[in-house]
Amino acid sequence: MSEKYTNEKYVVTWDMFHMHARKLAERLLPASQWKGIIAVSRGGLFPAAVLARELSIRHVETVCISSYDHDEQGELKVLHAAQTDGEGFIVVDDLVDTGNTAKEIRKMYPKAKFVTVFAKPAGTPLVDDYVIDIPQETWIEQPWDLGITFVPPLARK
């Protein structure tokens, strides 16, 4: 079902992310079964764009749930919700971690297919499909959260 990775930090490049998101799109074929995509903002916006392109889906909604402030998980707040029960929709997020957000998503969209690119053990039972297994204690650095910076050559240190 998925690939495994173990380490304290997992740095995802844009190329890796795109490859994994396309793999997820392949699993969602045929595209004709879907009415649209619901992206879990903000992390789900990136895989939603790839899925929308690969599956030729134009109807993209969002559900905006706030739970993280950089690396700290806090209280869930639903800021905006797509108005559907999810039937015929793919709900996509970048990651399922503790499962707190996923539980709320399942309540809101019980008939949707819920997928993520990455999954940690606590959240795995709550999604219908995912691409990469990540250990619970591993922090994922997503490419949209990173910047490119100069690193001096080792010989100069």
Curated annotation (Swiss-Prot):
Keywords: Cell inner membrane, Cell membrane, Glycosyltransferase, Magnesium, Membrane, Metal-binding, Purine salvage, Transferase. The keyword Lyase does not apply. It is found in: Cell inner membrane. This is Xanthine-guanine phosphoribosyltransferase. GMP binds at D97, T98, G99, N100, T101, W139, I140. The gene is gpt. It is a peripheral membrane protein. Mg(2+) binds at D94. Coiled coil: none annotated. Belongs to the purine/pyrimidine phosphoribosyltransferase family. XGPT subfamily. Guanine binds at D97, I140. InterPro entries: PRibTrfase_dom (IPR000836), PRTase-like (IPR029057), Xanthine_Guanine_PRibTrfase (IPR023747).
